UniProtKB/Swiss-Prot annotation:
<feature type="disulfide bond">
    <location>
        <begin position="223"/>
        <end position="236"/>
    </location>
</feature>
<keyword id="KW-0272">Extracellular matrix</keyword>
<feature type="compositionally biased region" description="Polar residues">
    <location>
        <begin position="301"/>
        <end position="315"/>
    </location>
</feature>
<feature type="domain" description="EGF-like 5; calcium-binding">
    <location>
        <begin position="219"/>
        <end position="259"/>
    </location>
</feature>
<feature type="domain" description="EGF-like 3">
    <location>
        <begin position="137"/>
        <end position="173"/>
    </location>
</feature>
<feature type="disulfide bond">
    <location>
        <begin position="120"/>
        <end position="132"/>
    </location>
</feature>
<feature type="disulfide bond">
    <location>
        <begin position="230"/>
        <end position="245"/>
    </location>
</feature>
<dbReference type="InterPro" id="IPR052235">
    <property type="entry name" value="Nephronectin_domain"/>
</dbReference>
<dbReference type="Pfam" id="PF00629">
    <property type="entry name" value="MAM"/>
</dbReference>
<dbReference type="InterPro" id="IPR049883">
    <property type="entry name" value="NOTCH1_EGF-like"/>
</dbReference>
<keyword id="KW-0217">Developmental protein</keyword>
<dbReference type="GO" id="GO:0005604">
    <property type="term" value="C:basement membrane"/>
</dbReference>
<feature type="compositionally biased region" description="Basic and acidic residues">
    <location>
        <begin position="333"/>
        <end position="350"/>
    </location>
</feature>
<dbReference type="InterPro" id="IPR000998">
    <property type="entry name" value="MAM_dom"/>
</dbReference>
<comment type="similarity">
    <text>Belongs to the nephronectin family.</text>
</comment>
<dbReference type="GO" id="GO:0005615">
    <property type="term" value="C:extracellular space"/>
</dbReference>
<dbReference type="GO" id="GO:0010811">
    <property type="term" value="P:positive regulation of cell-substrate adhesion"/>
</dbReference>
Length: 553
């Protein structure tokens, strides 16, 4: 049965309302979904892009930036997100990464547009983390010994603390511990430098022995071990670290070579080399020329009395001179050869002496009469036989030869000085003189050589003449002291115009003050070449001449 209209109308209205309600519900649900997207805003019942946003071709709201983001992207209304290396509101400014802290590069940084570049110093290479590592290795620099790779690069090493790196950074140089004074050896030992180290060794003339539970340097007795080089006609005396030689009675020489004094010889003929003989002649000729050029005479005294002889057989007193053997620890064969050679030289010298005496006496050279002719000045000369004589002092020009190798005077080395004077061969290979080499001692060190004149009280004036030489730059000073009650400095020389031998003079005036000795003192300078030398020492009666001729003239 059909429903009545009155009943059907309400049902129709409710159905229509239900249908529209469902559509509105669906439409509301879509708006809510759209409202959750960025840049979507709800305007009443409508959904639209927010301010600063606009719908793109895909129907999605996207932000807008004015005037835009040059090197970046717009992430909000007028809000830019810049790409790395750029900054600013519109991302148009470059970032200087090299000025940032910490610096992005280890060595060198160069800024670029929107980025930067790192560079390494020479000898290094760039790593991915912008650090620099040394590109050189130990195999590339060729060290002398060992090498170590470090952060700064390969480093050459020396195997000992006694070595140091050379300026080239590869080789090792020795450190001289002895010269630097970094080490001090025990008593009686000397420092010997080696490559990379050093050791302490006994001084020459000593040997290492184990005594009383410890090692010590003990003196070698060269005399008992027959390792000395003294002449067969000399006595050997052992000293600490060395030995001394002294000619036996009846012989003369330096102890290493001794020759017999002839029985019939004229007392101590002047045996100086030609330069000294010539100088004596010139000096005497000069003095006699002041006396109306009188001729030089050789006076042969008449025997009248027998004086008490005083024997002084040492032309150079080597009791204070150490004659060091070159091979103190053995080598008898070498020493025997030296002794044999010395003995042959002595025989030849002895024979030459006899012939020379006869020749000189006939030729009229200046010589010493066989008398105690030192009466004028108290000096006793050598006498092997008791002789009688009578002198007329006014007729004598007395000259005493105090040269080192054949003179008649006593010379001694000072024990309290810093170094000894050393014999040095003359240029003509005849005889020797005394010298101080530039390498002897240190700066300001003193070496003294004494000429002994016991009880010299001149009854007339005497002149001391000597040859000297100061060779080398800043080699030192030479002084001469006359030792008496005053010990006065009589002569001094510090420099020389050239390296030639020159002649010095000191006047010994008549008086009551006894002259005990004359001291030649050498003071070392800072020079490393040359020498200080003395030769041809003479005592001549009378006043010193006003002018002297050079030995080299």
């Amino acid at each position: 049965m059909p429903l009545p209209w009155s009943l059907a109308l309400p049902l129709l209205l409710s159905w229509v309302a239900g249908g529209f309600g469902n559509a509105a519900s669906a439409r509301h649900h879509g708006l809510l979904a759209s409202a959750r997207q960025p840049g979507v805003c709800h305007y009443g019942t409508k959904l639209a892009c927010c301010y600063g946003w606009r719908r793109n071709s895909k129907g999605v709201c996207e932000a807008t930036c004015e005037p835009g983001c040059k090197f970046g992207e717009c992430v909000g209304p007028n809000k830019c997100r810049c790409f790395p290396g750029y900054t600013g509101k519109t991302c148009s400014q470059d970032v200087n990464e090299c000025g940032m802290k910490p610096r992005p590069c280890q060595h060198r940084c160069v800024n670029t547009h929107g980025s930067y570049k790192c560079f390494c110093l020479s000898g290094h290479m760039l790593m991915p983390d912008a650090t620099c590592v040394n590109s050189r290795t130990c195999a590339m620099i060729n060290c002398q010994y060992s090498c170590e790779d470090t952060e700064e690069g390969p480093q050459c090493l020396c195997p000992s603390s006694g070595l140091r790196l050379a300026p080239n950074g590869r080789d090792c140089l020795d450190i001289d511990e002895c010269a630097s004074g970094k080490v001090i050896c025990p008593y009686n030992r000397r420092c010997v430098n080696t490559f990379g180290s050093y050791y302490c060794k006994c001084h020459i003339g000593f040997e290492l022995q184990y005594i009383s539970g410890r090692y010590d340097c003990i003196d070698i007795n060269e005399c008992t071990m027959d390792s000395h080089t003294c002449s067969h006609h000399a006595n050997c005396f052992n000293t600490q670290g060395s030995f001394k030689c002294k000619c036996k009675q009846g012989y003369k020489g330096n102890g290493l070579r001794c020759s017999a004094i002839p029985e019939n010889s004229v007392k101590e003929v002047l045996r100086a080399p030609g330069t000294i003989k010539d100088r004596i002649k010139k000096l005497l000729a000069h003095k006699n020329s002041m006396k109306k050029k009188a001729k030089i005479k050789n006076v042969t005294p008449e025997p009248t009395r027998t004086p008490t002889p005083k024997v002084n057989l040492q032309p150079f007193n080597y009791e204070e001179i150490v004659s060091r053997g070159g091979n103190s620890h053995g080598g008898k064969k070498g020493n025997e050869e030296k002794m044999k050679e010395g003995l042959e030289d002595e025989k030849r010298e002895e024979k030459a002496l006899k012939n020379d005496i006869e020749e000189r006496s006939l030729r009229g050279d200046v010589f010493f009469p066989k008398v105690n002719e030192a009466g004028e000045f108290g000096l006793i000369l050598v006498q092997r036989k008791a002789l009688t004589s009578k002198l007329e002092h006014k007729d004598l020009n007395i000259s005493v030869d105090c040269s080192f190798n054949h003179g008649i005077c006593d010379w001694k080395q000072d024990r309290e000085d810093d170094f000894d004077w050393n014999p040095a061969d003359r240029d003509n290979a005849i005889g020797f003189y005394m010298a101080v080499p530039a390498l002897a001692g240190h700066k300001k060190d003193i070496g003294r050589l004494k000429l002994l004149l016991p009880d010299l009280q001149p009854q007339s004036n005497f002149c001391l003449l000597f040859d000297y030489r100061l060779a080398g730059d800043k080699v030192g000073k030479l002084r001469v002291f006359v030792k008496n009650s005053n010990n006065a400095l009589a002569w001094e020389k510090t420099t020389s115009e050239d390296e030639k031998w020159k002649t010095g003079k000191i006047q010994l005036y008549q008086g009551t003050d006894a002259t005990k000795s004359i001291i030649f003192e050498a003071e070392r300078g800072k020079g490393k070449t040359g020498e200080i030398a003395v030769d041809g020492v003479l005592l001549v009666s009378g006043l010193c001449p006003d002018s002297l001729l050079s030995v080299d003239d």
